[in-house]
């Protein structure tokens, strides 16, 4: 328990101690969230509004120039935007020119293409002789033609026959209606299917009662009705 109390005291002391000197900083932390850091710089540098997060951001970046306007708009300072320090640019990003690495893929040397036409006497899949000097030369047969050549006989020219005159086209006769090959036959009568639900007469809710005579309004007619 005493350790937690000591830790809480040290934490409160760290927040209560004045901050190290910083340009544009009054030396204390104001935990008010009513004004932002950029507005306080433009309004009054003596009453600077800072929070621990805003003080840390002001330590790692240069403060806004006091031109009387904000460069990024009024809504930016309500969001946490991590900004890298511009005072110490990384040195490993810039390489000397002789250490430049090409971005594109390395170009492979172009292999000269061999002719696709097979050499007579050699198969396209078998290697040539000059690539195998130690092997004995194989017996090669002379290139033979698949069919013996025959002398071309001169053809006798036949006399050209006269062209016959074209006959006139006959008129097309109307097509007669043909009887259908398979006349439509009436289907045989099908048997009636039994009803799915049996239709039984439902008993009337009110039984049929004989109508009663209306009572006569006149005394003389009442006797006749009775």
UniProtKB/Swiss-Prot annotation:
<feature type="compositionally biased region" description="Pro residues">
    <location>
        <begin position="183"/>
        <end position="192"/>
    </location>
</feature>
<feature type="modified residue" description="Phosphoserine">
    <location>
        <position position="32"/>
    </location>
</feature>
<keyword id="KW-0272">Extracellular matrix</keyword>
<feature type="compositionally biased region" description="Low complexity">
    <location>
        <begin position="88"/>
        <end position="120"/>
    </location>
</feature>
<keyword id="KW-0597">Phosphoprotein</keyword>
<keyword id="KW-0964">Secreted</keyword>
<feature type="compositionally biased region" description="Low complexity">
    <location>
        <begin position="137"/>
        <end position="182"/>
    </location>
</feature>
<dbReference type="GO" id="GO:0005576">
    <property type="term" value="C:extracellular region"/>
</dbReference>
<dbReference type="InterPro" id="IPR004116">
    <property type="entry name" value="Amelogenin"/>
</dbReference>
<comment type="similarity">
    <text>Belongs to the amelogenin family.</text>
</comment>
<dbReference type="Pfam" id="PF02948">
    <property type="entry name" value="Amelogenin"/>
</dbReference>
<feature type="region of interest" description="Disordered">
    <location>
        <begin position="86"/>
        <end position="196"/>
    </location>
</feature>
<feature type="signal peptide">
    <location>
        <begin position="1"/>
        <end position="16"/>
    </location>
</feature>
<keyword id="KW-0677">Repeat</keyword>
<keyword id="KW-0091">Biomineralization</keyword>
<dbReference type="GO" id="GO:0030345">
    <property type="term" value="F:structural constituent of tooth enamel"/>
</dbReference>
<protein>
    <recommendedName>
        <fullName>Amelogenin</fullName>
    </recommendedName>
</protein>
<comment type="function">
    <text>Plays a role in the biomineralization of teeth. Seems to regulate the formation of crystallites during the secretory stage of tooth enamel development. Thought to play a major role in the structural organization and mineralization of developing enamel.</text>
</comment>
<dbReference type="GO" id="GO:0070166">
    <property type="term" value="P:enamel mineralization"/>
</dbReference>
<keyword id="KW-0732">Signal</keyword>
């Amino acid at each position: 328990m005493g350790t937690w109390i000591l830790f809480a005291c040290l934490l409160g002391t760290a927040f209560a101690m004045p901050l190290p000197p910083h340009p544009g900083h009054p030396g204390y932390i104001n935990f008010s969230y009513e004004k932002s850091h950029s507005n306080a710089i433009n309004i009054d540098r003596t009453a600077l509004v800072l929070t621990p997060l805003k003080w840390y951001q002001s330590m790692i970046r240069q403060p806004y120039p006091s031109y009387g306007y904000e460069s990024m708009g009024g809504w930016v300072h309500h969001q946490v935007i991590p900004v890298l320090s511009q005072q110490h640019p990384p040195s490993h990003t810039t390489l000397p020119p002789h250490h430049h690495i090409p971005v594109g893929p390395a170009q492979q040397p172009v292999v000269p293409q061999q002719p696709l036409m097979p050499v007579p006497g050699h198969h396209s899949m078998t290697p040539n002789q000059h690539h195998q000097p130690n092997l004995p030369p194989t017996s090669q047969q002379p290139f033979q033609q698949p069919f013996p050549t025959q002398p071309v006989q001169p053809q006798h020219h036949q006399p050209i026959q006269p062209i016959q005159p074209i006959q006139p086209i006959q008129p097309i006769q109307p097509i007669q209606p043909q009887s259908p090959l398979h006349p439509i036959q009436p289907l045989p009568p099908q048997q009636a299917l039994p009803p799915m639900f049996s239709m039984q007469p439902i008993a009337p809710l009110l039984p049929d009662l004989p109508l009663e005579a209306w009572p006569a309004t006149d005394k003389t007619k009442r006797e006749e009705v009775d």
